[in-house]
Amino acid sequence: IKEIVFPDSVVDVQDYAFAGCRSLKKIVFPDSVKSFGKDVLCGCTSLKEVQLPKNMEWLSYSMFVNCTSLEEIDIPDSVKVIDSCAFEGCTSLNRISLPQSLKTIGVSTFRGCTSLEKIKLPDSTKQVQGNAFENCEALTDIKLGVGIKSIESKTFQGCSSLEFIILPYQVETIEDNAFKNCTKLRKITIPKATTSISDSAFSYPDKMTIYGVAGSYAEQYAKKNDIAFVAQQIATEKITLSETELTLGRNEKYQLTAGLNPMDSTDEVIWSSSDEKIAKVDKTGNIEAISAGEAVIT
């Protein structure tokens, strides 16, 4: 089998449905498909062209693992979660577009994607789980979404071409081996919000420089570990909010995010409500509707 095009009547694709179909080059899933099992296309080593349903919300576990000929893919605008190992071992993958709806990237999602050179995570992304980009040996350019609060264990381990990275302003923790064996990493910008960095986060501290805010935890960490530190003060030129108008029911909550330009701006984001009897907002931008009316969140 080299090509599969489904009729619109298909609503469910089961586990391992096409696993090991090594001659399959093209597959088109209709918009009628609502769910996918795990390992659906695992080991389809000739697969080059995929069309996914427009309304899918979840890219399933190990869906494209070891699809070694897959070079590019567009993820539908409705997808909220890319499950663990979804593209692990896709050694030819060099372009992927991620939607503004995306919330979570699972464990080892892009592990071993050795041709992936750059990727942009949307600001809607809240979590990038451990090992997500492990051994992406060609990765040189990655933009992380502003909603991310933790760089989890081994997220960028073995990204041997990565020379610099800017961590978003809300990142609080950098976990064990987050940048282990990043042999070319020379510059990392760490925000004021960061309050915890593992002693094993970096393999070559003597070769790198941390850029951050004077007096921050990042500076303390740099001094403790004999890492060069450069204090910087960069003004925000533009702020982009995830929503400009929002309607919430009583007691309903919504997480608002602010994208800063330039990304390494050192200005602090402070949230406030024009009327806390109608809507409250905490220091992270989490809004809670209290009663009927209108309030301006700034």
For every predicted segment, state its role.
Residues 1-12, 22-35, 45-58, 68-81, ...:
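Structural signature of tandem-repeat unit edges
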Residues 195-198, 284:
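A generic local structural motif
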